[in-house]
A protein has these predicted regions:
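Helix-to-loop junction immediately C-terminal to a conserved catalytic motif
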Residues: 53
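Conserved ABC transporter NBD signature motif
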Residues: 61-73
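Short helical segment in ABC ATPase nucleotide-binding domains corresponding to the A-loop/adjacent helical element
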Residues: 93-101, 111, 115
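Conserved ABC ATPase signature
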Residues: 130-134, 138
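A short, proline-enriched helix->beta-strand linker immediately N-terminal to the Walker B motif
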Residues: 149-153
Length: 252
């Protein structure tokens, strides 16, 4: 197992007092898997992702990556947040190099890898452009390449498509899914979009209302060889959707 979350519990202080965010959460992932976390709004999805990233401190329990306990931010873990967080005054190549520079890994070898990633994923001709000259989808691809450049063992994605319009969102999620499959990258996605989770994931972890627990796990490995768009047309897509929706127990 590349990720093991063992009985993770976490509380935090709010203006209204102590809030129990996570209650005895346990889950695991195999290397190369793409999994998603879904749950009701405000249930603690991003809090759990932050704990795995080493940005939140557990009250009890543990999180292991490659058998080593997570005690803070680690170069083994890459995080792609909701916004692309590109610096508008830097070129695309400079933006992609930032993570490596922060880690003091700006070497000829790392620069060659960045050049290869930009070429492989269609951004080489934009390397000297500014982020404002790119489409929303290309900006997200740039943000992904920046994260992949540090060669993380695990990639955490915190609703990275939420700022995109629907059509762009479909195209970019399919694009990023293909890149991660090609790279053999282990990835964990937080999303509020059930369809997005089904179209991209090998498994879905369904969280309960706060305090969050793992209420159910939906196995989608029968769809593993299909692209996100092909999955949306698959006969079982709506079966999976209805099953996840039922587990979420959302009343409208």
């Amino acid at each position: 197992m590349i990720i093991q979350v063992r009985s993770a519990a976490l509380t935090y202080q709010s203006a209204d007092g102590e809030v129990e965010a996570l209650r005895s959460i346990s889950l695991s992932m195999n290397e190369g898997e793409f999994c998603s976390i879904v749950g009701p709004s405000g249930c603690g999805k991003s809090t759990l992702l932050g704990a795995i990233a080493g940005l939140e401190t557990l009250d009890s329990g543990s999180i292991l990556v490659d058998g080593e306990e997570v005690r803070g931010p680690s170069p083994r873990i890459g995080l792609m947040p909701q916004r692309d967080q590109l610096f508008e005054w830097k070129t695309i190549q400079e933006n992609v190099m930032l993570g490596l520079q922060v880690r003091r890994r700006d070497t000829p070898e790392s620069r060659r890898r960045v050049a290869e990633l930009l070429e492989r994923y269609g951004l080489a001709e934009f390397a000297q452009k500014r982020p404002g000259q790119l489409s929303g989808g290309m900006r997200q691809r740039c943000a992904l390449i920046r994260t992949l450049a540090i060669e993380p063992r695990i990639l955490l994605l915190d609703e990275p498509f939420s700022a995109l319009d629907y059509q762009t969102r479909l195209a970019v999620s399919a694009d990023i899914h293909a890149i991660l499959r090609r790279e053999g990258q282990t990835a964990l996605l937080v999303t509020h979009d059930i369809s997005e989770a089904i179209s991209m994931s090998d498994r879905i972890f369904i969280l309960s209302r706060r305090p969050a627990t793992v209420k159910a796990v939906r196995d989608l490995r029968e769809l593993k060889d299909l692209t996100p768009l092909q999955r949306r047309d698959h006969p079982s897509f709506h079966i999976h959707f209805n099953a996840v929706w039922k587990e979420l127990d959302i009343h409208v």
